[in-house]
Amino acid sequence: SKPVPQDEALVTYARRLNRTDAPLDFRQSAAVVAQRVLALEGWPGSTFEHRGVMIKVGAARGEDATSSGTPGRILSADRSGVRVACGQGVLVLLQLQRPGGKMLPVGEFLAGFPLAVGETLASAEMPAFVATAPFPRAPKA
């Protein structure tokens, strides 16, 4: 095979991941949040704060369903998943983990840590992973 020259105008830069990438922003579309959960699986993971506790998300999927709820509002919570309103669509949380616990299917998680319909989960800004210009380097210590 012959080398194919790349179009320099389409170059993107990726930065290193860190713990500040973990919090989720439910104001984004459900598809974007679900892709972020998948991208950050393992470390640093994806999290949201609820009642002062950081909950880690192990698996989620986006649904195109329309929701009239405020982004972050819990629409339903049962064994099939916790449905959370997003900026566009609905995010279904499938696996959750409390601090110091293990990752559980949502049905088992809800048995020990109920999430009530109507409660709102905290959103946090999700910084971009890629850019068209290089990211600034942190100063060396």
Task: Give the label of every model feature segment.
Residues 1-14, 18-20:
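Donor/substrate-binding cores of folate-linked one-carbon enzymes
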Residues 21, 26-141:
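An anion-binding loop in the catalytic cleft
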